[in-house]
Amino acid sequence: MSDVESGTLEPFSRDMLADPYPAYRALRERGRVQRTPAGHWLVLGYDEVSTLLTDQRFGEAAGRGGRIRLSRTQREGPHQLLGRVDTMLSQDPPEHTRLRRLVSKAFTPRSVQKMRPLIQEIVNELLDGLAGRAEFDLVSELAWPLPVIVIAEMLGIPRADRGRFKRWSDAMVATLGGDYSSLDEARRSNEELVEYVSRVIADRRKQPRDDLISRLVAAEESGQKLSEDEMLGTVALLLVAGNETTAHLVSSGMLALLRNPEQMARLREEPSLLPSAIDEMLRYTGPVHTTRRTAREDVRLGDANISRGEVVVGILAAANRDPEKYADPDRFEVARNATDHVAFGDGIHFCLGAALARLEGQVAIGTLLARFPNLRLRHNEPEWGGTFAIRGVTRLRLRSV
């Protein structure tokens, strides 16, 4: 019996990568909060996941290591790869509050919206390369290059160095996602990234520009500024968190449209639905599937009594398909307007790059639909990749004529 049929979680199995939702549904029907044989907790219901994300009795910092047994390689690997200090993702207040306030000053909605013309230009350039081609892989030609180029432009990185940024990001993402076979390469990439960004920071201190690193250098809150280590951690986090997840939003979102041609036709007819469609893609097939917290005190969550220090894994993707929250949750509807999904998390750790990811998705998918009216899937199935934390399409062959 497969893991999908039995309702168990085998994160790296072919069945789970191709379609984890039947297993999530089966697990949720057994219990919205349940203990695993390994001794930690899974949370699958929308309300319960929302509480996990917003209730400050659950924290981030205490959870690293937690009660999940890790090998030495696992313990020493991922947490060294986002700069030389903890990032916002691994901190609780008050340090998280201070750091997020400082970084937010350089990442305002206005700053993100100013990126729209540039993102449109990048998308146009990438799609120009597909003109006249009857067939192409959406992932390698658009979904993967786009976020790396956008992030490099935000940071003020020269075009000639984009390839290096892509290599650094790919190596670090693989390890942070659970692939420890490439740990040495990820460490080298981290060292190269730190050295490179340190030089850029030093340059921006002397000669500020209109870019994100200059804004990080200038950011100040109550007389406090970001240390160099904090800036390095923030840049590395942006590079890692903004690369794979946005790429998967574009590729998996397009796959959802192509598998639901009536919804794609409606979106073509009503392009004003594009913001709603992007949020539906995030709800229906969002790239981030899980997040982890640790109970900072004894907590009752749903019907479960969770003890202080116990690790709790929230399955965001299961919450986003909870029938108690969404009517007909396994149906993809571009007009659903599901802005309350938890694909970006919630609470103090809500994704700082959510507005940018939405904007990239809107520009990429909207332009693709406008320029390629005859898009359709090839007969072969798409290829899926990822881990228990992040999942997405890694190859998607399309025909355009």
Where are these regions (language model features)?
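Cytochrome P450
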Residues: 1-401
